[in-house]
Structure formats: structure tokens, C-alpha cells
């Protein structure tokens, strides 16, 4: 059996067991994963704005670099992130290690609580001093404007590409953990 299959099967068993054992703990881990990524997104936005005053060309890199730290938090603190669950659980369902209906239930539950965790932390950041002073030149405003200016197809393909990078990073972490 390949190392990938071993990791997928182990991850599926662990996620399914946690989900069956305690929905509350699973929800909390999912909320924390959403919060970790919101935290790194917020810090990345401020970092991008700060660096843009001196070296504007680096602002997108700074944001991406700081955002990646949120993924590290998810991995280190065992958060339940919908993106990685899509990889593990879908692969597990494909290989028959988890039922398709159970996979969909866990994914919906995880995605919902990722969103709840992100919303709660985003609300707190919205109340902070740093986010009260965003202007139309701010990284956040220009990033959202750029995203809204793209076609649906471009956003779809960029989303898939971003998820591929996240899953490669998570799989790499899992394989290096041995």
C-alpha cells in the first residue's frame, strides 16, 4: 500500500472517530481552523498595507507569506480545515474507507464551523483600531476589487489552484511528520 493511501486511511479513521465521538469537539476544532486562517489573513492585510508604503510590489507576497502561517497553525494545533478534509475524505470515500454520505456530512459540518470561527474572529478584527483606518488604497479593498473584476471561471480556477497548494502543503506535512 502506498504511503499516501496509508495517510488517507489513517486520517479518515481519525476524523470519523472524532466526529462520531464528540460533535462539540469537532465543531471547536473546525472553528479554530477558521479562526487561525482569519487571524493570519487579518495580520497579512495589515502587513501588506505597511509594506506597500515602502515597497508596493512586495505587498501581495507579504500577504501570502503571512497567510501561510495560518496553515501552519491549523496543522500544529490539529484544526479541522474543510480544504484538507476534502482531500482526505474524498480519497477515503473513493477507496471505500468511509461512506459517501458520511463524508458529505463531515464536510458540511466542518465547512459550516470553519465559517463560524472565521466570522467570530473577523468581527473582532473589524472592531480593532487597525481595521478602522482602511482606505480605498488599502490592500484589502484593492484585493477584493481585483477579485470581483475577474470572471467566474478565473475565480474558479484560481480557487482550485489555491486548494491544490494547500493540500500539497498539508500532505507534505503529514509525510514529513514520521
Describe every region a protein language model picked out.
Residues 1-178:
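Alpha-helical transmembrane segments and their helix-helix packing motifs
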Amino acid at each position: 500500500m502506498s504511503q499516501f493511501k496509508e495517510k488517507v486511511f489513517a486520517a479518515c479513521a481519525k476524523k470519523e472517530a472524532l466526529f462520531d465521538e464528540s460533535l462539540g469537539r469537532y465543531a471547536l476544532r473546525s472553528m479554530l481552523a477558521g479562526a487561525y486562517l482569519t487571524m493570519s489573513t487579518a495580520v497579512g492585510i495589515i502587513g501588506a498595507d505597511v509594506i506597500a508604503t515602502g515597497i508596493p510590489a512586495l505587498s501581495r507576497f507579504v500577504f501570502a507569506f503571512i497567510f501561510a502561517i495560518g496553515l501552519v497553525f491549523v496543522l500544529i494545533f490539529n484544526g479541522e480545515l474543510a480544504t484538507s478534509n476534502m482531500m482526505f475524505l474524498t480519497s477515503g470515500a473513493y477507496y471505500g474507507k468511509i461512506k459517501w454520505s458520511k463524508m458529505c456530512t463531515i464536510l458540511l459540518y466542518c465547512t459550516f464551523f470553519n465559517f463560524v470561527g472565521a466570522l467570530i474572529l473577523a468581527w473582532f478584527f473589524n472592531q480593532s483600531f487597525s481595521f478602522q483606518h482602511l482606505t480605498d488604497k488599502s490592500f484589502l479593498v484593492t484585493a477584493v476589487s481585483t477579485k470581483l473584476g475577474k470572471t467566474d471561471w478565473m475565480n474558479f480556477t484560481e480557487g482550485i489552484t489555491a486548494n491544490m497548494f494547500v493540500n500539497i502543503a498539508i500532505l507534505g506535512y503529514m509525510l514529513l511528520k514520521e
